Amino acid sequence: MTQTQPVETIPQPRHAPVAVPTAGQPYEYRRRPLVEPDWTRFPGWRHVTREQWENAQWQRVNCVKNIKQLRTVLGDLVDETFYADLEADQKALATMSMLVPPQMMNTMVPFAPMTTEAFLADPIRRYMIPVASDRRTDWPSHPYASRDSLHEHDMWVAEGLTHRYPTKVLAELLSTCPQYCGHCTRMDLVGNSTPAVDKLKLTLKPVDRYDAHITYLKAHPGVR
């Protein structure tokens, strides 16, 4: 269970004692308690109570879905250059629409002052809310790159059911997700269409799609 603390009382991270790696394990893993950053550092959540924050329904309702909502959350913590950069990406380059839960937003620049530079440099922000300047449009794509980079659609044995390995299948039961990662490997199906990507659509009713999955699995007992 995570702990939460006001930002002014959050202790400085302590480095674990240096441990001698054991045989076969060349890395040292630092262990420290998980402390949830103070969400009230965001102007838009300044008055959000702990009870609200820890409520799953509140988290779902308050997901950031567009630039206007992001402005409300961030306030004046970042400047206009960031929003212009994000808008340019959304209009021409983005493969996923924006959907970021508050808890995920709260992992961005967790314990340092929030500035435009810090927000741009944050690795989780880069993954969840990419901006145009993040992308190397001057570099060509790999010649074998495609929208469905894992070729899962090519291997559908029923709508939404990929059978690539002898004993395993991948069932895509929904075309939505609790959050949309900016560089999702299943962006060809998941989420809303964007100016850059006209997404595939599941056409069968869910009950018919699931029945087709079950029928296939019954006919292939080698799938575990």
List the model feature ranges, each with a label.
Residues 176, 180:
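The −1 position to Zn-ligating cysteines in a subset of zinc-ribbon hairpins
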Residues 2-164:
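Flexible, acidic/Gly-rich N-terminal and inter-domain linker regions that tether
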Residues 129, 137-172, 182-224:
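Conserved Radical SAM active-site core
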